[in-house]
A protein has these predicted regions:
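Hydrophobic alpha-helical transmembrane segments of membrane proteins
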Residues: 1-77, 85-238
């Protein structure tokens, strides 16, 4: 459906153009004018970039992943009679959406952080965070898209603007904000202590790793629960 719909291609090209402009702004950003603050400012920008990448993911998934089930239209009955389970059907939608979203988001994050020249620790933390955020947001979009389908919609834009699409965006924004806090706070704590040449205490180390683990667990649970809820909703349609 995506390949046959010219309007979706045009919207995707527009999105890619905006991403290029976004990256260019990081490329020409001159933080060396404030040498005493450049290190701190770079890391702050990196955390802002993580949040922006999360919001970009939310925008992409609500536009291209959330309508995936609804795009089957009246032909969905064929899926129900096909020799595959509805779970396999929905997970195929998940993996199809995950790959491009993950590649685009990781590229956006890695390149922006490279242009900023941030600390290697924060580079790795951001890349790993994007991986887990992609799993959660694609799972959330696919699951809610199955729970609130609109098989009679004329185009994917109507699906994205439906009740389910609005609910997804609200939940996605809340998730991105929570994820940024769970990644940003411990990362800032670690970098602040390292800049001062002071080692983290044992309790602080546990707090840092607990925060990272909580973020990873929240992402996996969000994606898995959403997919499970979506499969159950499809099964109840019959």
């Amino acid at each position: 459906v995506f390949l046959r719909d010219v309007s979706q291609w045009s919207q995707l090209l527009l999105l890619l153009a905006l991403v290029l402009v976004y990256l260019y702004n990081f490329r020409v950003l001159d933080l060396e004018r404030v040498p005493y603050m450049s290190g701190i400012v770079k890391n702050v920008y990196a955390l802002i970039n993580l949040g922006m990448a999360g919001f970009v993911m939310a925008t992409i998934t609500v536009r291209f992943v959330f309508p995936a089930v609804s795009a089957e239209g009246a032909a969905f009955w064929i899926v129900r009679t096909a020799p595959i389970s509805l779970g396999d059907f929905l997970w195929s939608k998940f993996w199809t959406g995950l790959v491009p979203v993950l590649v685009l988001s990781e590229t956006l994050t890695v390149l922006a952080n490279q242009f900023l020249g941030i600390d290697p620790f924060l580079k790795v933390a951001s890349a790993v965070a994007i991986l887990f955020m992609s799993l959660a947001l694609v799972g959330l979009a696919t699951g809610l898209g199955a729970r609130y389908p609109r098989f009679n919609a004329e185009n994917p834009t109507q699906v994205a603007g439906s009740y389910g699409g609005v609910m997804f965006m609200i939940l996605a924004v809340l998730f991105v904000l929570i994820a940024c806090v769970l990644v940003g706070w411990p990362s800032s704590l670690y970098l602040w202590h390292r800049a001062r040449g002071v080692a983290l205490s044992s309790s602080q180390q546990w707090t840092v790793w607990l925060s990272f683990a909580t973020g990873a667990a929240l992402s996996l649970v969000t994606g898995w629960w959403s997919m499970r809820s979506g499969v159950r909703a499809l099964e109840e349609m019959g």
